[in-house]
Amino acid sequence: MSESEPVHIEYADETELLTEFRNFMSDPDTREKAANYLLNSLIDESILGIVFEVHHAYKTGSVAAIEGQPEDPKSFTIVDMPDMDVFGSTNSKKAIDCSCPNCNRIVAASRFAPHLEKCMGMGRNSSRIASRRIANTRDGGNYFGADEDDEDDADWSGEKRKKKIAPVRTNGSKKNVMKIYFL
């Protein structure tokens, strides 16, 4: 049996393995060989892992993404001046203003979308308002001769029904059952 071949020995139980290990490690020459073998194996595995990672990075082209562009060290200097933050920007809390393309008013950026919606007549109520305007500007009568044919209709824009949730126990059980009542 040569020294380069791996040795495979089967043991009957754990105690036999431990006694054989203790006998093997009691010899200083064997202990030194085992320590050197372990150290060389760890170094080889580490180097091989790094070589494979670098090779894979170059083959896939991800080295350029990892290395990136050289950075300008001046852009990372910390500024210590009054009225400026650490990056050199002024500490202004001025709100950003926008100009409405419809009416040319200056509006705060946080209110620009609601303003534009109302200004252009695109809001959620604008279709109702438009239909009211059309109804008011229409000629005096309609086909049936009545001024308003929807006077007797239910008012769907009125109050909404409120839900009242009441916990109720049924049949003496401990489980709560929720019943919903409409007022």
Swiss-Prot record:
Component of the transcription regulatory histone acetylation (HAT) complex SAGA, a multiprotein complex that activates transcription by remodeling chromatin and mediating histone acetylation and deubiquitination. Within the SAGA complex, participates in a subcomplex that specifically deubiquitinates histone H2B. The SAGA complex is recruited to specific gene promoters by activators, where it is required for transcription. Belongs to the SGF11 family. This is SAGA-associated factor 11 homolog. InterPro entries: SAGA_su_Sgf11 (IPR013246), SGF11 (IPR051078). One of its GO terms (cellular component) is SAGA complex. It is found in: Nucleus. It comes from the Eukaryota. Component of some SAGA transcription coactivator-HAT complexes. Within the SAGA complex, participates in a subcomplex of SAGA called the DUB module (deubiquitination module). Its main location: nucleus. Residues 146-156 have a biased composition (Acidic residues). Residues 140-167 are annotated as: Disordered. It holds the Pfam family Sgf11. One of its GO terms (biological process) is regulation of transcription by RNA polymerase II. GO terms for molecular function: transcription coactivator activity; zinc ion binding. Keywords: Activator, Chromatin regulator, Metal-binding, Nucleus, Transcription, Transcription regulation, Zinc, Zinc-finger. It comes from Culex quinquefasciatus (Southern house mosquito). The long N-terminal helix forms part of the 'assembly lobe' of the SAGA deubiquitination module. A zinc finger (SGF11-type) spans 98-119. The gene is Sgf11. The keyword Zinc applies.
